[in-house]
């Protein structure tokens, strides 16, 4: 979710310097951080376009840090704030993304089972898929 739908850096920018120093090299453990993030450019519009297309059964698949219990609820609250009622019931939080079935997985990192996912991994932020517009163009011809 973060790095694909939610802009991690935007949340981090809203946290005090003192908190950033305390959590240096483990920013994802900052309580409340995930609820502070702004949407990635084009992400909300892309989610709605893919949903309206009707060809894809769309879910939000994410991982939450084990040492940050608020991240689990923060991610749900983020979806409720930025997306419609459909999506808050379509969040799956797991550390084993490869256990889920699907044709496509849009993710920015090959961790937590992403690189072993059975379907096609669309690596968000890569040279091939630098933004949501490139992802939408790719999915339109599938």
Region locations from a protein language model:
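Short catalytic/ligand-binding loop motif for oxyanion handling, primarily in non-cytosolic enzymes
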Residues: 6-9, 58-60, 67-71, 99-101, ...
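Structural recognition of alpha->loop->beta junctions
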Residues: 77-92
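Conserved Lys-Pro-Asp/Glu-containing loop-to-beta segment of HAD-superfamily phosphomonoesterases
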Residues: 88-116
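Short, well-ordered beta-to-alpha junction loops that form the rim of enzyme active sites
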Residues: 1, 62-64, 108-110
């Amino acid at each position: 979710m973060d790095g694909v739908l939610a802009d991690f850096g935007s949340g981090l920018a809203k946290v005090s310097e003192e908190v950033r120093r305390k959590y240096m090299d483990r920013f994802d453990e900052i309580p409340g951080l995930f609820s502070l993030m702004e949407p990635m450019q084009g992400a909300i519009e892309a989610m709605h376009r893919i949903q309206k297309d009707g060809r894809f059964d769309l879910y939000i698949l994410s991982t939450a840090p084990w040492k940050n219990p608020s991240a689990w609820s923060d991610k749900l609250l983020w979806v409720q704030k930025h997306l419609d009622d459909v999506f808050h019931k379509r969040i799956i939080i797991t550390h084993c993304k490869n256990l889920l079935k699907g044709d496509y997985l849009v993710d920015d990192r090959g961790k937590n089972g992403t690189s072993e996912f059975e379907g096609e991994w669309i690596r968000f932020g890569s040279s091939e898929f630098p933004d949501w517009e490139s992802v939408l163009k790719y999915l339109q011809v599938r």
